[in-house]
Amino acid sequence: MKKIMEQMAEELSAAFEKAGYDPSYGKVTVSNRPDLCEYQCNGAMAGAKAYHKAPFMIADDVVAQLSDSRIFSRAEVVKPGFINLDVKPEFVAEYMNKMAEDEKLSVETAKNPKTIIIDYGGPNVAKPLHVGHLRSAIIGESIKRIGRFVGHKVIGDVHLGDWGLQMGLIITELKHRKPELVYFDDSFTGEYPAEAPFTISELEEIYPCASGKSKEDEAYRNEALEATHLLQQGKPGYMALWNHIMNVSVTDLKRNYANLNVDFDLWKKESDAQPYIPDMVEDMKKRGFAYEDQGALVVDVKEESDTKEIPPCMLLKSDGASLYTTTDLATIVERMKLFQPDEILYVVDKRQELHFIQVFRCARKTGLVNPETKLSFLGFGTMNGKDGKPFKTREGGVMRLENLIADIDEEMYRKIVENRSVKDKDAKDTAKIVGLSAIKYGDLSNQATKDYIFDVDRFTSFEGNTGPYILYTIVRIKSILNRYVQEGGDLSIGKILPAVNASEKNLMLQLSGFAAMVENAFEEKAPHKICAYIYEVSNAFNSFYHETKILSEEDQAQKESFLQLLQLTRRVLETSIDLLGFSAPDRM
């Protein structure tokens, strides 16, 4: 199904051609002055230079070809040469009906589907998720959903940090606290216990304690470094402990991510890439890419066009230990081997930009990826408190993610109970659904690359550009449709008729932009464009709702038309919020 703007552009292009001009000037855009017209074409302005002719004259020639237009009810030339356009209500209604019949609401499936791996989430095991983990998880999840909706094969990978010093610190602290455990007995030859010698809450206390000690006690730090080394060498007792740490930690991470409605296809870890490192490093040395610099092994990645210094990409430290760059490069090797992706996208803090410039350049220079494989980095900004500084607890500490979710849920519960629109037994569940919309929409409505203020009062409001406002609109539509069914109406009967007033036509025009918006949101990896769109659709619907008697309309065909339009609006809004990663309750 052709997008509405494509159909308009085709007609404009044909008019340019008939008038003797290049059809490529027939591009149509949404009007930047909706008080004057619905759409506009600026092609005559662009063509004036090529044809040595006043733009007003070119526009006049083109408009003359639109006198019997199937699409436009008005085509008017405005000096110095703009073409202002209004669309026929019949054409818009016809498009609405086709859109309603289309399973994907007029979004075309990608003609050349790609395999795309999105690396997002990225927590370290044995540490609780905190608010700093929020953005990667929900931005990555949304981009994954949008990519799948437009027809690509998108694989989400959490890429756990499980192989660094934190493991050595936990093992060392456990050894100090419980030296009698069999994991520390070098003479032990039996099977290690199936049950972990700690709970998740104990594990989350052990790590910060060990980390604090290592900063003050050099001998303790050296012991932890040695434990890390022995683990990486495959010491049986330490490997068994590592498995326990992983199992306990991943179970808790899955629970926390489920509360955010974030779901990963792969739970790959840094350790999964370790087997690829020796051959990868050896190959880079053999082919002359890697060389020693002050004892470390590095690859030059600077380019002549650089405007700032890009240091060499370090593969191995002087003691032979690998780094994040090594692991990330080996992970690329693993991903190319297992999935042959067309693109790998990393959704991480923008402060890691230099790291990824080095990794991507090294991967390209050394041939770890195919020349056509796209490596991309979406660096997001910081989530700040009202003071403009990184979001903290009232005491100034880093807030755990589950505490933030609980605080938002509590605030939504209070507002819902005040509203008394939901039975008390359902209020808690409804508060969770609406609370998640407040968090996700509050974040995703901002351009990912920018910092933003996390304002609990604003994000949980039922008014303005918020998640709860969008859900309130969906619930309002559901309520009208349910009432019609309860009165004996059949929602499968009827079709959308030409708009009877300006607010209805505006709603239809907003809905007609769905396909172009989704495709653009994926192309630019920009979930904020979905938020901006559904806010406009919600406003358009609420204006229509306040100006139109829907259920009391006496003309049955007209009433059925309104209800078909409501069903389409609900589908567009529900599909959009699903792409953002949340859903709507039945009542609020």
Please identify what each model-predicted range represents:
Residues 1-93, 110-588:
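Non-catalytic interaction-recognition regions
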Residues 94-99:
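Short, charged, solvent-exposed linker or helix-capping segments at domain edges/interfaces
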Residues 100-110:
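Flexible, low-complexity linker/hinge segments
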